[in-house]
Amino acid sequence: MSWIEPIISHFCQDLGVPTSSPLSPLIQLEMAQSGTLQLEQHGATLTLWLARSLAWHRCEDAMVKALTLTAAQKSGTLPLRAGWLGESQLVLFVSLDERSLTLPLLHQAFEQLLRLQQEVLAP
């Protein structure tokens, strides 16, 4: 068991999602309002991905807004990034160094992804 597993497990429980042990290196959570949250461990990094499908007519504006906000470092204190999957799925993500991972940092990263998503999707 990795030393960060209890942190990830506690984070998932805080979101109301029970976990089993041992944790998979890829955890996928369906969020009712914000799409799919994935937590992926790779090397010494934990990446949080927040993906949401959009209606075709919102894609171009959302893509430009997401890339502008993340490129301008207006996304908060963590290095948030934006991308696109397929034809209509907005993906916002942040990679965290496992050595500095704490439960508050994990919550902060998730909250910043949610805020960025709200900014991107705001009219």
Curated annotation (Swiss-Prot):
It is a peripheral membrane protein. This is Chaperone protein SycN. Disulfide bonds: none annotated. It comes from Yersinia enterocolitica serotype O:8 / biotype 1B (strain NCTC 13174 / 8081). Interacts with YscB to form a complex which specifically binds to YopN. Keywords: Cell inner membrane, Cell membrane, Chaperone, Cytoplasm, Membrane, Plasmid. InterPro entries: T3SS_SynN. One of its GO terms (cellular component) is cytoplasm. Functions as a specific chaperone for YopN. It could facilitate the secretion and the subsequent translocation of YopN. The gene is sycN. One of its GO terms (biological process) is protein secretion.
